[in-house]
Amino acid sequence: NQAKVIARLEGIVAQQSRQVEQAAYRRHQSLDKQFHRTFFDYSGNARLVRAYDDNIVLWDTHIAIYFKDYRSIWTRTVEQHRQILSAYQAGDYQMAQELMAAHFLEAVIPLKELLSQEDAAPAAD
């Protein structure tokens, strides 16, 4: 039920905050996945869950390469999770959905920038 989901999400966000303070990268990533998966599972949207499952290995690789040493990004992630959860708790599901979409899109920006730089670099002889 919704109260259980909210309690679980609150617990995950609280744990994430502690992991950022302790610079516990692997635990933070595990909690990040738990946060997203909890929302997706509760949505009842099988297509969304399948898309998440189909792309999680690629996503984990992306995160490991581009975000591992970026503690400020971890802090931003926790803040975004708080905002998503707050909107959800307030019953503003449209806002929660928009915040979740923005959260995912923002995470892709460093990868796009890196790929653009590689495309613009002159080829080595």
Residue positions per predicted region:
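Conserved amphipathic alpha-helical segments that form helical-bundle/coiled-coil interaction surfaces
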Residues: Q2-Y66, E79-A87, M95-E106
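Solvent-exposed loop and edge beta-strand segments that line ligand/cofactor-binding
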Residues: D69-I73
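C-terminal effector-binding regulatory domain of bacterial HTH transcription factors
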Residues: Y93-D125
